[in-house]
Amino acid sequence: KPNFIRF
């Protein structure tokens, strides 16, 4: 699964 930053 892709990594992404959650704000």
UniProtKB/Swiss-Prot annotation:
It is found in: Secreted. The keyword Aminoacyl-tRNA synthetase does not apply. GO terms for cellular component: extracellular region. Keywords: Amidation, Neuropeptide, Secreted. It comes from the Eukaryota. Signal peptide: none annotated. The modification Phenylalanine amide is found at residue 7. One of its GO terms (biological process) is neuropeptide signaling pathway. Myoactive; induces a rapid concentration-dependent muscle tension increase. Belongs to the FARP (FMRFamide related peptide) family. This is FMRFamide-like neuropeptide PF4. It comes from Panagrellus redivivus.
